[in-house]
């Protein structure tokens, strides 16, 4: 038994062959906000063909695209990339149809020679407090939990050791 939980998309389930020899539990991972903290919530056993799930995945992808545009503008202002449109095209190619995130920008910065490796890209430009660390307004965690439940899923906190709460 296994689950594919990509950020903000269930598209992997549409591209799988009907017989892969594994029992897959359909899943998704959403970014959300709770008490000024970015919290990731996994939805297990969601209906990947639900119209509501498709809608919220599209909304999250739009949020990520707006965030990517902001990141590209900041990197361009520091002359780390040649053009905003070129960077967005480059990260889209790297993302291969999945939602765009900072790891795609890290790979792009390596690809164009602005950084030696993705670790350096994060350390210098994309990690917390750096120019490419663009905060987004994620939906509240309760809203995300509602989306998951509406699609028949079970919400699970992702990366529980990451959050410093008591």
Region roles according to the model:
Residues 81-137:
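Hydrophobic, aromatic-enriched interface-forming segments
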């Amino acid at each position: 038994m296994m689950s594919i939980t990509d950020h903000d998309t269930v598209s992997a389930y549409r591209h799988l062959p009907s017989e892969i020899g594994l029992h897959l539990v359909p899943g998704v991972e959403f970014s959300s906000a709770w008490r000024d903290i970015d919290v990731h919530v996994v939805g297990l056993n969601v209906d990947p063909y639900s119209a509501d799930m498709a809608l919220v995945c599209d909304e999250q992808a739009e949020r990520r695209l707006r965030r990517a545009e902001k990141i590209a503008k900041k990197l361009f202002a520091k002359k780390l990339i040649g053009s905003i449109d070129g960077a967005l095209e480059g990260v889209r190619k790297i993302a291969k149809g999945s939602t765009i995130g900072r790891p795609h920008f890290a790979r792009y910065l390596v690809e164009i020679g602005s950084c030696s490796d993705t670790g350096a890209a994060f350390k210098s430009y994309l990690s917390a407090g750096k120019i490419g660390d663009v905060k987004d307004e994620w939906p509240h965690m309760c809203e995300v939990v509602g989306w998951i439940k509406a699609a028949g899923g079970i919400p699970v906190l992702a990366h529980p050791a990451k959050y410093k709460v008591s």
